[in-house]
Curated annotation (Swiss-Prot):
Similarity-based family: Belongs to the YAF9 family.
Described purpose of this protein according to its UniProt entry: Component of the SWR1 complex which mediates the ATP-dependent exchange of histone H2A for the H2A variant HZT1 leading to transcriptional regulation of selected genes by chromatin remodeling. Component of the NuA4 histone acetyltransferase complex which is involved in transcriptional activation of selected genes principally by acetylation of nucleosomal histones H4 and H2A. The NuA4 complex is also involved in DNA repair. Yaf9 may also be required for viability in conditions in which the structural integrity of the spindle is compromised.
Domain YEATS positions: 8-157
Protein name (Swiss-Prot/TrEMBL): Protein AF-9 homolog
Organism: Eremothecium gossypii (strain ATCC 10895 / CBS 109.51 / FGSC 9923 / NRRL Y-1056)
Cytoplasm keyword on record: yes
GO CC entries: cytoplasm; NuA4 histone acetyltransferase complex; nucleus; Swr1 complex
Note on domains (UniProt): The coiled-coil domain is required for assembly into the NuA4 complex.
One Gene Ontology biological process: DNA repair
Length: 208
C-alpha cells in the first residue's frame, strides 16, 4: 500500500509500454524428461519490455492461470523475467494478471491471451518465421493520476521508448507505427474514392 501522505497528482498520467504473448516450437526427438508423451510443443508466455528492458520497477509479479489440466495451473512469477515455459499439445486461453509494485497502489491488470501453437495461415494475412510460432502484442499501461511516490519512481526510469526501426528481435517500433498509419490512410483514401464513384453514379442515374 502507498503511504497515507502519498497524494495523487491530478490531471497527470504516466504510460509504460509492454509486449505480451507467447512463442512456441514443435518438439522433436529432444524433449524434457517430464513432458507427457502426448505433448507436441514447447511454449513460453511472457510479459516484457518492448526491447527486453527491466520492468520490475513498476511490475511486482505476474500470475498466469493455465488450463485446468496442468498441475498447479495458477503459476506466480514474482521476479523478472516475467515468463513461463511449459509443454502441451493444444491451444487455450491463458488468464494473465499483472500486479504492480506496492508504491503504485494500483489495482492489478487482468487480461487473456490465446496461446498460439500453430502457424498463422497466409489467408489471414499473418505469418510466423521459421519453425517458431510467435503471437506477440504491444500495449501501453497507463497510470492515471499516480501518487507522488510512484510518480517519482517512474520518472527515474527512461520510459522504455520505442526504437526508430524494426529489427528481427523487436518489430514494435516507430517504423511499424508509421507503416500502420500509412495503411490506414490508404484504406481511408480507397473508401473515399469508392464513395465518390458511387455518388457520381447516383447523380447520373437521377439525371436520366
Amino acid at each position: 500500500m502507498a503511504p497515507a501522505q502519498a497524494k495523487r497528482i491530478k490531471t497527470l498520467s504516466v504510460a509504460r509500454p509492454i509486449v505480451y504473448g507467447n512463442t512456441a516450437k514443435k518438439m522433436g526427438d529432444v524433449r524434457p524428461a517430464i513432458a507427457p508423451s502426448e505433448h507436441t510443443h514447447m511454449w513460453t508466455i511472457f510479459v516484457r519490455g518492448p526491447q527486453g528492458e527491466d520492468i520490475s520497477y513498476f511490475i511486482k509479479k505476474v500470475v498466469f492461470k493455465l488450463h485446468e489440466t496442468y498441475p498447479n495451473p495458477v503459476r506466480v512469477v514474482d521476479a523478472p523475467p516475467f515468463e513461463l515455459t511449459e509443454t502441451g499439445w493444444g491451444e487455450f486461453e491463458i488468464n494473465v494478471k499483472v500486479h504492480f509494485v506496492d508504491e503504485a497502489n494500483e489495482k492489478m491488470l487482468n487480461f487473456y491471451h490465446h496461446l498460439r501453437l500453430h502457424p498463422y495461415t497466409e489467408e489471414d494475412g499473418r505469418r510466423s518465421d521459421g519453425d517458431e510460432v510467435s503471437s506477440v502484442f504491444y500495449d501501453e499501461i497507463v497510470f492515471n493520476e499516480p501518487n507522488e511516490a510512484f510518480f517519482a519512481k517512474m520518472i527515474e526510469q527512461p520510459g522504455n521508448l520505442l526504437p526508430s526501426n524494426k529489427t528481427p528481435d523487436c518489430v514494435f517500433s516507430l517504423q511499424l507505427e508509421q507503416e500502420e498509419i500509412d495503411r490506414i490512410q490508404q484504406g481511408i483514401g480507397k473508401v473515399d474514392e469508392e464513395i465518390e464513384q458511387l455518388k457520381q453514379k447516383l447523380e447520373q442515374d437521377l439525371a436520366k
